[in-house]
């Protein structure tokens, strides 16, 4: 399943011209964070065992249907479902779509956490993994240069503002609910302080 999901990322990145700050390397990083959070939560929540494919696939695919990167979110979701259909059940695909279409920072800040039923912890694992990956200021710079065509110095300046206004507030905004993410975010927060 993971091989197919990463293949999907490579194909969608090319097809939709998704910049490198949200492509394969980012998907790999979010998947690694999600795997660590999953392992840390499994002992307390053994029901997660049946949701591992949902968590890992969501972590890998989370940006491939985002309206910031694709012109038609519904079409991208349909294509992703078709691409992954031989590797995941319809129920798993439904859960993945519910997670990846509601986990963005802006949606959470605006609407709070969605009701994803039995997948609540899976949702938080994937969402937190993506937030942890945001502690890389170079990704912000790359996004500014690639997508917004900013000069390096301007992209650095904007990235610094984004870090202060958003990333460095993740902890005080209470966006981490799992213990592993709380500890890792503190480590990343302290090493990323601007």
Question: Model-predicted segments: where are they?
Answer:
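Hydrophobic, well-structured mid-protein blocks that either form specific transmembrane helices
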Residues: 79-115
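An active-site-proximal "capping" alpha-helix that borders the catalytic cofactor pocket
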Residues: 30-35, 72-86
């Amino acid at each position: 399943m993971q091989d197919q999901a990463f293949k999907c990322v490579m194909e969608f990145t090319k097809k939709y011209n998704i910049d490198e700050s949200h492509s394969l390397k980012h998907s790999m990083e979010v998947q690694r964070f999600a795997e660590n959070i999953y392992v840390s939560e499994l002992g307390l929540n053994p029901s997660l065992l049946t949701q591992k494919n949902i968590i890992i696939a969501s972590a890998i695919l989370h940006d491939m249907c985002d309206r910031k990167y694709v012109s038609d979110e519904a079409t991208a979701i349909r294509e992703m479902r078709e691409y992954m259909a031989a590797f995941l059940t319809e129920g798993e695909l439904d859960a993945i779509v519910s997670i990846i279409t509601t986990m963005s920072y802006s949606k959470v800040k605006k609407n709070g956490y969605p009701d994803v039923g039995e997948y609540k912890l899976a949702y938080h694992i994937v969402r937190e993994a993506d937030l942890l990956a945001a502690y890389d200021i170079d990704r912000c710079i790359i996004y500014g240069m690639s997508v917004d065509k900013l000069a390096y110095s301007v992209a650095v300046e904007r990235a610094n503002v984004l870090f202060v206004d958003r990333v460095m507030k993740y902890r005080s905004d209470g966006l981490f609910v799992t213990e592993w993410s709380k500890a890792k975010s503190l480590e990343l927060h302290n090493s990323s302080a601007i």
